[in-house]
Each structure stands twice: as C-alpha cells, then as structure tokens.
Amino acid sequence: LCLDEFHQASPEEVDQSIYTLSNGVSKIRSNQDGSLASRKRWKLLFLSTGEIGLSEMLEKVQRSPKAGQSIRFLEIPVIGKYNAFDDIHGYASGKEFADAINDKIKNNHGSLIQPWVEHLSNIDDLPTYLITNIKELTNRWQFNSKGNQFGYALDRFALLAIAGEMATKIGLLPWDCGDSEKAIFNIVESWIAARGYESDSEDQFLLKQLPKALNKWRNK
C-alpha cells in the first residue's frame, strides 16, 4: 500500500494510523442493534511516497515517534546519484526517467498479479517456505544485533528480497538472480546508517539519558 501525499494528513491521524495499518485489525464496533460487528482484518506492507518522514510529521505537534511506530514505519533515506535513482537508464535526468516510468505505469499495471498469485499458490506450505528462507537470508546478512525491533524490521526487508528473487526466477522481472537481494541489502544499510544503531529504541534512549542522570545525581 503506497500512501501518497503523506504530508497532507494531520499529525494526529498519522500517529494512530501507523498502528492501525500495521496491526491488521479494525477497532471493535457495534451494529445498530447493539451486537458486536465483525472486525475487519488485513495483512500488508505499506510505505509513504512523500518527501516527509514520520519524525518530521510528529514534530509539528511536539511529539516523537514511539518505538513501536518507528519500527513499523521505517524511515529510509533515498539519496541516489540522480536524486532517488542510481541508474536512469539512458534518460537525461532523474526527473525525465521518473516521468517515463509514470507514463508507462498508466498503460501497464496489474499484468503480473495473476502469474504471481498462481506461482505462490503452487508452493507447498508457503508460510513455512517463507519463514525458512527469511531466516536463512537474515543469517547470511550477518548483523550482530539481537534486538527484537531490529529483527522485526530485518524480517520485513528479507521478505521483500525473497519476493523479488522469486519473481526473477519465474521470469516476471528482467533482473539477474541476486539483484533483488543486493538492492534490499543496500536499503537495509541505508536504514541502519540513518537510524544510527541496531539495538532496540528503548535501550538507545536509556544510553542517551544515562549521562544526564549521572550529572544530576552527582550534584545532589
């Protein structure tokens, strides 16, 4: 799910929506007769296509992202050789390349969904297949962190890499084997560099507050 024009939403709505989208279940509501309505459920990956991140959004109302929010809505810097791109495939500029992509999308979209779903449906025990491959890939990436939040994010990155590799192998993407994994790994490294640490946010908060606490109590 791509969230466009993210900056036009109110910070208060964004604050709550991050949990709503990621938790995958609607609020408990009642029918007109007072009985409980059935709860809607979903499972999705979502991203913002806007230029503003969650931290900047919440700063408008003097708030900071909670640990749960920051790990559900990852802030990934997009800085390429040509703005958002590293390769503009022969076009004169990043803007010209982006405009060409937008033009192609208008006439070519949805054509891969049927063969993709057919492929997934032919995999025996898809959940086990994904769990096994996600674990193998994250182990191969060899990050040292044991933090639960970092591991949660890494699993989501690995899922995207695996999906890309699967699509490449069955001819749905014109990439070479390993391209998807390499691209996602580069994104992981950018995310870690921008985040500044691999541990859980609460641990980092305590480390930042420790010098302040020591100075405070030393002067008592």
Feature roles, as predicted:
Residues S35-A37:
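Helix-rich terminal scaffold detector
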Residues K40-K43:
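Short loop/turn elements that form and flank the Walker-type P-loop nucleotide-binding site
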Residues L1, A9, V14-N31, L45, ...:
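Extended alpha-helical interface modules used as scaffolds for assembling large macromolecular complexes
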